[in-house]
Amino acid sequence: MAKHLALSVAAAVAVSWLAASSAAAAGFYEKFDVVGAGDHVRVVSDDGKTQQVALTLDRSSGSGFTSKDTYLFGEFSVQMKLVGGNSAGTVTSFYLSSGEGDGHDEIDIEFMGNLSGNPYVMNTNVWANGDGKKEHQFYLWFDPTADFHTYKIIWNPQNIIFQVDDVPVRTFKKYDDLAYPQSKPMRLHATLWDGSYWATRHGDVKIDWSGAPFVVSYRGYSTNACVNNNPAGGWSSSWCPEGTSAWIHRELDGAELGTVAWAERNYMSYNYCADGWRFPQGFPAECYRK
């Protein structure tokens, strides 16, 4: 489910930040904008160097942040520790979006909470020119609430790669005759919100507010990306930082494609290219291509 729906909640909710120390928060404020209820976010430093951001969700508000810059291609990663216990109905996200319009582009990583003892679902999705419905969903091979794990999006002109702890789990390839996010600059977003209408068992399981507040922690944010703050888009290598060569032409090799196949075989819980009920007139064109 795209965050243009989610953020209609988050935007109304609005979020701001309480910093445990002004020094810890200063660098964060240089990179991100936040709005809203100040007591729903904390920016702290564990060791004087590492920033940790805690987002909170309760009945009154969700929380989130968005990058000041917009990007056209890049490598984006963050470490996250998800909501523990009964997290049913909650949605935690790390994603890129060009905005809320009908023709928007978006690249999603979302975590859909579940009842205690049941696994989280990691939802990946790609939107191009307003066309989404390209979800691959996975259970994880570890408990994402017990410790921090690294989630990464690599977005370049050839493909989009989703990684978990440096393990590729999905690649979405560009085809010249099909829509692909390549012209609209996107901002980075992170949110924690109430997705009861959708997130857990197709909305059958709602948030148990007796367990609030729900908290998710972010740290170790890293980006190597081409900054493009021109709404009209366009791309030039001059906008890209040092180190761009590590990802700008990156495609998965045979061994990495084997890792994707391993993830699909052992942990995939949903593949839009196998959902005939959803696509009775035929699957999207990319489903038929290798």
Swiss-Prot record:
The keyword Repeat does not apply. Glycans are attached at residue 114. It is an enzyme of class 2 (transferase). The keyword Disulfide bond applies. It is found in: Secreted, Cell wall; Secreted, Extracellular space, Apoplast. GO terms for cellular component: apoplast. Xyloglucan binds at residues 110, 123-125, 133-135, 197-198, 278. Residues 1-25 form the signal peptide. One of its GO terms (molecular function) is hydrolase activity, hydrolyzing O-glycosyl compounds. Contains at least one intrachain disulfide bond essential for its enzymatic activity. Lower level of XTH8 transcript detected in Tanginbozu, a GA-deficient semidwarf mutant, and higher level detected in Slender rice 1 (slr1), a GA-insensitive mutant showing a constitutive GA-response phenotype. Catalyzes xyloglucan endohydrolysis (XEH) and/or endotransglycosylation (XET). Cleaves and religates xyloglucan polymers, an essential constituent of the primary cell wall, and thereby participates in cell wall construction of growing tissues. May promote elongation of three internodes (II, III and IV) and may be involved in cell elongation processes. This is Xyloglucan endotransglycosylase/hydrolase protein 8. The lineage of its organism: Eukaryota, Viridiplantae, Streptophyta, Embryophyta, Tracheophyta. The gene is XTH8.
